Amino acid sequence: MFNYEELFQTHKTPFYLYDFGKIKQAFLNYKEAFKGRKSLICYALKANSNLSILSLLAKLESGADCVSIGEIYRALKAGIKPYRIVFSGVGKSEFEIEQTLKLNILFLNVESFMELQTIEKIAQSLGIKARISIRINPNIDAKTHPYISTGLKENKFGVGEKEALEMFLWAKKSAFLEPISVHFHIGSQLLELEPIIEASQKVAKIAKSLIALGIDLRFFDVGGGIGVSYENEETIKLYDYAQRILNALQGLDLTIICEPGRSIVAESGELITQVLYEKKAQNKRFVIVDAGMNDFLRPSLYHAKHAIRVITPSKGRKISPCDVVGPVCESSDTFLKGVHLPELEPGDKLVIEKVGAYGSSMASQYNSRPKLLELALEDQKIRVIRKREALEDLWRLEEGLKGV
């Protein structure tokens, strides 16, 4: 059992704590699942882009799935090789495209004809040939939260089969484009295998047609999205996921690219917070803690439910349902409703579980609240991997006040 009391002697709440052993094992599980085929596991930085986490993954020969030039530079800073980086996203600016081409990453995932032409124009101005992949929208329901579903035709991501074919043929004829991959990503937090099987089969068929037309494909990018069990849901077995994708690619000599994020880091992370007050209103019990929605947005944004446990000794205290809420001035600043917890006192400590993904990476300074301290548990030792922001950091980049 981890000794939290030692942490509290040196670190004030709230803070994030990541178990690096869990991150390492989760990544190695992906490498093992796809070992029967040429593959590249590109960790999705959007889930958690802390440099220490990226450095850990770089040492394991991870690639990177990036959606901004900032993420690309983070990946490079952490030691991930350019030839293992892919650049995705529906809205790449000309500046980002130019910088990316100069960095000579593996390829850019293209999401529209206009973007393709922009890449071609910039590549021509640089006198180079841009390696590209085209993201195909297979019009398949991922059966996940609508905010993170990306594979239906009404979603903003990717292009349909007909337009994809036109884009590939355009790229094939261009002196400044090199189409080397097909790509799809139908959504995040997938808990069912059938949508990914259907998408893999559909896009594999398209890939075979493209190869028959003389397009020299080398990669088959299946995106990411395997879900995590937040509420004891049954999840996809990684081995089954990999095998079904491998089956869909029979007859195709392509390197598989997979872009996991959540399933690599989610279960490694905890948000440790302490009780400020208890109150009752209209016979409802509230436990008010020092972490807020600005620190961890998922419950407010997605109505996500993360288990909460008490780590302060509380034996013998009466247990009753309560809402665990933060100090931010929003009614949505609620971590969990109706959770059964013992009577709590100011200073008691709680742990919000499985927050390693889309926790710190989505944090903000809303209500002028500094971003949190982040700690790593590695080889039985605790170290700081992000300092807590000081109050002065809230306005450090602002200008315009004389004499301040």
Regions found by a protein language model. Name each.
Residues 2, 18-25, 48, 114, ...:
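Conserved active-site and cofactor/substrate-binding residues in soluble primary-metabolism enzymes
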Residues 63, 86, 107-109, 133-135, ...:
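Structured core elements
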Residues 45-49, 70-71, 91-92, 112-114, ...:
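Active-site-proximal loop/turn and secondary-structure-junction residues that shape catalytic pockets
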Residues 2, 8, 244-246, 253-404:
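Charged (often Lys/Glu-rich) extended helix/loop segments that serve as interaction or gating elements
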Residues 54, 77, 97-102, 119-122, ...:
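Short acidic, glycine/serine/threonine-rich loops at helix termini
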Residues 1-130, 172-178, 205, 209-212, ...:
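A charged N-terminal "starter" segment
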